[in-house]
């Protein structure tokens, strides 16, 4: 059996997948691989304001899972508010130590409502925990345009200073 599409063939795209090397943001400056998966507590960003999603948050922030070894190396404890960052942006989240992840990998679900701490800042920082400020704004291929959220390298550190309030659910003035 052979499946073909004349319409797709007409696009002139390569017939086979190709290897896309990691972006320039990876490496020693940003040694952790971010998994930005679909959330278990809401449907994408729908119902982020709902009881199930809100109950999963820590100090009003989305949980980020991190291996205990990576957390210890950075002075991060369970429940600490942390800042994830790379050259694209930053976001705040709450650390959850987990042996379910390999060292060098952290996991922060997508779908948290974007809440810019300072909308005028050169580099965006979401105070609520949306990983989209860290990922490339590029689809996985010219055909699929899928999420490239699994191709993101970051660093993480304890957040110091006053914790900004989450205003994502506040109505406009």
Where would I find each of the regions flagged by the language model?
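Long, low-complexity segments enriched in small/aliphatic residues
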Residues: 1-52
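Long, contiguous, secondary-structure-rich segments that constitute the structural scaffold
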Residues: 49-65, 69-173
